[in-house]
Structure formats: C-alpha cells, structure tokens
Curated annotation (Swiss-Prot):
It is found in: Cytoplasm. This is 1-(5-phosphoribosyl)-5-[(5-phosphoribosylamino)methylideneamino] imidazole-4-carboxamide isomerase. It comes from Haloarcula marismortui (strain ATCC 43049 / DSM 3752 / JCM 8966 / VKM B-1809). Signal peptide: none annotated. The active site is at residues 12, 134. Pathway: Amino-acid biosynthesis; L-histidine biosynthesis; L-histidine from 5-phospho-alpha-D-ribose 1-diphosphate: step 4/9. One of its GO terms (cellular component) is cytoplasm. The lineage of its organism: Archaea, Methanobacteriati, Methanobacteriota, Stenosarchaea group, Halobacteria. It is an enzyme of class 5 (isomerase). Keywords: Amino-acid biosynthesis, Cytoplasm, Histidine biosynthesis, Isomerase. It comes from the Archaea. Belongs to the HisA/HisF family.
Amino acid sequence: MYPEFEVVPAVDMQDGQVVQLVGGERGTEKTYGDPVEAAQRWVDAGARTLHLVDLDGAFEGERQNAAAIDAVLDAVGADVDVQLGGGIRTAEDAVSLLDRGLDRVILGTAAVETPEIVGEISDEHPGSVLVSLDAKDGEVVVSGWTEGTGLDPADAAGRYADLGAGGILFTDVDVEGQLDGVRTDPVRRLVDSVDIPVIASGGVATINDVLALRSAGAAAVVVGSALYEGQFTLDAAIDALGESSE
C-alpha cells in the first residue's frame, strides 16, 4: 500500500454523478459529471490509486451508487488500485466488494460502532481496510460527518492499528472542499501515533499543500476540489513530487 507518497484523486458520487461538498455539508455540492469519465481522466493523467466515495451511502447508511461503482471498476480497475468508502456497514458487504476486485474498503461509521469488524475483514483480506477518522473541531464524526463520537483521532487510530487496519484515512472536515489550504499539525499527530500509513484529506488547494502533507509524514493525499476546479493538474503535482525528492 502506497510504496511511495502519491496524490490520490477523489471520485465522490451522489445520484450517480461526481460531486464535491464544501465542509461535508449536504446542499453545498457542485457536480462534475460522469464517474467513469472522471476516473479515466485521472488514470490517463498518471493516478496510481482512485478514491471512490458513495456520498449517498455515507448519509443514508447503505450503498446507493453500486452501478456507478461497478462501471468504474470495470473501466479502470485493472489499471489502478481502487478504494471505496461510504455506506459499507457490514463485514459481508466489505468482503464482497474486495472479492469483486476492489483493493481497499474504507470504514468510518461501521468501525466506530463495531470496531471488531476491522479484524474480521482484515483476517480474510489482510491490509485491505482503511479506517476513516474524519475530524470536526478535533473530534471524530460519523454518519456522513453529522454525528460526534467524543473520540480523539490519534487515540482511536492506535486502537484500529491493533485490530489490523491497513491504514488510517484522516479527513480534516473543517477545511474539506474549501480550497483554503491544509492543516499539518493534526496529520503529524496521527502519523506519530501509529505505525501504519496515514492518508490525508481535506483542504488541499495548491501543490505546496501536497508537499507539506508529505513532509508531515502522510503516505498519500486524497485531492478532490483542487483538481476538479483546476487549481493544479494531477500530472503537475506528480512532477513536483518527483522533483522535490531528487
């Protein structure tokens, strides 16, 4: 998983279309067209991993965009790694997706409500579970970022690492989709708390934000709005990462 730092384009889906939300709030979405076309565009630009999110599933509690997800897997699943979150609530559902060809499942609400699910899935598909720790005001939130849990992200991360999680996906909800830049301190704190990869998400507006997250110790960064709004291109970010590591 993530042998070297990479930029992972987001393909967030709502009603079968690619959208981006501001601050995780329903009603703020901006639509960007067909998921397969978006996925293919990112693969052609050099993506090694795609980050799919079923937003309807995240809000409603069960996956709603199965047809679009299947279409993306059929189109590009053989070319890149694909990870999916949103509405995955049972081990059976997760395993069926992994058996279908998905590389990683992302668990948020399910992992908080039933932590042992992480171990159940990991026993059958080692390294395949990313636990999503989405933080608002320093607290892990679930159910489409609408419910607080009282959990501290760094404290929770250690527990999931012990249960066999392959990585932690950390979304800084307070800056998500706002194109105002990233906050590296929460990422550093998570990286220091676990020995598994931490994938950062939320707030990326420039290539310098990408480089800052790599310096903070993240294994990868998920980018959505900045790519869709043309703040920078994926191939330019990939080039900058290569140049800065030389």
